[in-house]
Every structure is written in structure tokens, then in C-alpha cells.
Amino acid sequence: MLSWYKAQLAARPLLTQAVTTSILFGVGDVAAQQLVDRRGLSNHDLTRTGRMVLYGGAVFGPAATTWFRFLQKRVVVPGSTNKTILARVAADQGLFAPTFIGIFLGSMAVLEGTDVKEKLQKNYWEALSTNWMVWPFVQMVNFKVVPLDHRVLFVNVISIGWNCYLSWLNGQ
């Protein structure tokens, strides 16, 4: 299975990572509804899961893939691996995270037919501050030990819990 996935990454990296992200965003929402909200299968909101799947595959997966490639090529401190890692984490947490938390919440509001401004005012700072408690460490590990082609997958696996949280927060 791993060799098949690696072959897909080599042949179609953007598509493979978009599909992977789509699936794992869906898993995060199912976990949020079934394990956190304890909705039960009969009360599972398939539309909500569909929104997460759509956002993961159409927005976050391609964006994260492109972002990690950009960081790899453009954010480099010559002669210092550790400073390069810190610079990438700073860029990720100072630019990508604040932007994509806003895009996530705004996208969910649009797909739900609710007010974007209200959604952002209600949830943005809580999501971003929680992000800053979790993701800087995760990204340090990601940039230090995970090969570029597997960084989105690594983030997606960790994101099962994070997406569970975001899905729960979005549903509040």
C-alpha cells in the first residue's frame, strides 16, 4: 500500500495529496460528530461531512502542497538547518495558518449559507490561538524529519484530531 501511495505521489502529487486530504478531512468530521458530539449514525450530518471533504480536497490539500513546496524552495537560511526550520515554522504560523483558518471558516459559512463575518467574529481568534498551541511544534517536527513529498500526509494524519476540533468549533 505504501509503495502504491509513493508511486501515486510521484506520478500525480497534487491530485494524490488533494484526495488524501479530502478523505482525512472527512474522517476528522466523522470523529467530531461521532466521538465528540456523540450524534450516533442516525443523526450524522452527511452534508457537514461533505463540506469538510470538499474543502479538504478542493482548497486545503492543493494549497498545503503548494505552500510546502514554496517553503522548501524559498525559505532557506544558508548554512543553518535549524534556522531554516524556525523560519519555515514562523512563515507557516505567521502567514499560512492565519490565512487558512480564515479561509476555512469563511468557506464553511458560504457552504452553510450563513454569515461569513459573523462566523469569523465568533470563531477566528479561538481557532487561531488554539492553532498556535498545537501546530508550531508539529511543523517543527514536519520540517525537520519528514521528506517534502510526505509533509502534507504527515499534516493530514495529525489533522484528524485538529479537523475534529475545527469541525466541532465550526458547528458551535
Swiss-Prot record:
Compartments reported by the entry: Mitochondrion inner membrane
Question: Does the keyword field hold Ribosomal protein?
Answer: no
Recorded topology in the membrane? Multi-pass membrane protein
UniProt main location, coarse: mitochondrion
Q: Which GO terms describe its biological process?
A: ethanol metabolic process
Instruction: Give TM segment ranges.
Output: 13-33, 52-72, 94-114, 128-148, 152-172
Per the record, the similarity remark reads: Belongs to the peroxisomal membrane protein PXMP2/4 family.
| Descriptive protein name | Protein sym-1
Query: Which organism encodes this protein?
Result: Neurospora crassa (strain ATCC 24698 / 74-OR23-1A / CBS 708.71 / DSM 1257 / FGSC 987)
Q: What is the lineage of its organism?
A: Eukaryota, Fungi, Dikarya, Ascomycota, Pezizomycotina
